[in-house]
C-alpha cells in the first residue's frame, strides 16, 4: 500500500523525514521515530487528501529505504559477501529492491530475491509455523512463555 501510494507522489520535496539512527554505530534498525514523524505530519493536516497520502508515503518509503541501506552499507564494510539474500514483506518493495541491487553490484555480490509472489508479510510464515505445531499437538502453557517486546540484541554476529 505504501509503495502504490508513493508512486502517485506529485511533490517529492514536500515532506522530509530524518533517517533513524543515522549516526548510531549499532547495526540495529528502528522505525518507531520515523513512524512518529509521519504521525506528527499527519496531525498537522486539517483534512487528508489522496495527494497528502501519496506525498507522505513517498517520503516514508524513501527514508525507510535509506535507513535500511545505511545499516547494510556498514554490514558490507565488515564482511565480503558472495551472495546476499533478502526475504519477508519488505523485500517486495520495488524501491528497496532497486537500491539493494545497486548495493550488491557495488560490492561485487549476487543479490538473492524471491519472486514477488512469495514476498509476503512474515505473519503468514509465523501462522504457518503455528499451524504445523498445532497439527503435531506441540503446545506450551501460556504461563511458561516469556514475552519481551523490547528485547535487545547486544551483539550481532556477522
List PLM regions with ranges.
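Adenine-nucleotide phosphate-binding core of ATP-dependent small-molecule kinases
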Residues: 27-28, 39-85
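Glycine-rich phosphate-binding loops at beta-strand->alpha-helix junctions
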Residues: 81-100
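Conserved phosphate-binding/catalytic loops in two-lobed NTP-binding clefts
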Residues: 84, 101-126
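Glycine/Thr-rich phosphate-binding loops that ligate phosphate moieties of nucleotide
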Residues: 146-158
